Amino acid sequence: MARIAGINIPDQKHTVIALTAIYGIGKTRAKAICVATGIAEDVKIRELSEEQIEKLREEVSKFTVEGDLRREVTLSIKRLLDLGCYRGLRHRRGLPVRGQRTKTNARTRKGPRKPIKK
């Protein structure tokens, strides 16, 4: 298994799919990384040479991924909570933040229904 950005990349998968195992890299960014390094998207990780894997490491290191990205997201949410702005209040209450309706939907964000006590 190749190790990129502190993550063991599954070597039986194609390069594009395997790169998405890294937090912060989706399909679009994975394709861009493959184009930048000159590696075909349909080549499996185990078929890559050590220098190609090193190219992938260098390209991935240009992005904020894994622990740094998680920390950045957590700090930005914490900043909203500390400001006491509308978005921060929605985060604090566990409600949808981006204007979605809450009268009927939003079960994922609100959690399971609470029974009404009579």
UniProtKB/Swiss-Prot annotation:
<dbReference type="GO" id="GO:0003735">
    <property type="term" value="F:structural constituent of ribosome"/>
</dbReference>
<comment type="subunit">
    <text>Part of the 30S ribosomal subunit. Forms a loose heterodimer with protein S19. Forms two bridges to the 50S subunit in the 70S ribosome.</text>
</comment>
<feature type="region of interest" description="Disordered">
    <location>
        <begin position="94"/>
        <end position="118"/>
    </location>
</feature>
<comment type="function">
    <text>Located at the top of the head of the 30S subunit, it contacts several helices of the 16S rRNA. In the 70S ribosome it contacts the 23S rRNA (bridge B1a) and protein L5 of the 50S subunit (bridge B1b), connecting the 2 subunits; these bridges are implicated in subunit movement. Contacts the tRNAs in the A and P-sites.</text>
</comment>
<dbReference type="GO" id="GO:0006412">
    <property type="term" value="P:translation"/>
</dbReference>
<dbReference type="GO" id="GO:0005829">
    <property type="term" value="C:cytosol"/>
</dbReference>
<dbReference type="GO" id="GO:0019843">
    <property type="term" value="F:rRNA binding"/>
</dbReference>
<dbReference type="Pfam" id="PF00416">
    <property type="entry name" value="Ribosomal_S13"/>
</dbReference>
<dbReference type="InterPro" id="IPR010979">
    <property type="entry name" value="Ribosomal_uS13-like_H2TH"/>
</dbReference>
<keyword id="KW-0694">RNA-binding</keyword>
<dbReference type="InterPro" id="IPR019980">
    <property type="entry name" value="Ribosomal_uS13_bac-type"/>
</dbReference>
<keyword id="KW-0687">Ribonucleoprotein</keyword>
<dbReference type="InterPro" id="IPR001892">
    <property type="entry name" value="Ribosomal_uS13"/>
</dbReference>
<dbReference type="InterPro" id="IPR018269">
    <property type="entry name" value="Ribosomal_uS13_CS"/>
</dbReference>
<protein>
    <recommendedName>
        <fullName>Small ribosomal subunit protein uS13</fullName>
    </recommendedName>
</protein>
<dbReference type="InterPro" id="IPR027437">
    <property type="entry name" value="Rbsml_uS13_C"/>
</dbReference>
<comment type="similarity">
    <text>Belongs to the universal ribosomal protein uS13 family.</text>
</comment>
<dbReference type="GO" id="GO:0015935">
    <property type="term" value="C:small ribosomal subunit"/>
</dbReference>
<keyword id="KW-0689">Ribosomal protein</keyword>
<dbReference type="GO" id="GO:0000049">
    <property type="term" value="F:tRNA binding"/>
</dbReference>
<keyword id="KW-0820">tRNA-binding</keyword>
<keyword id="KW-0699">rRNA-binding</keyword>
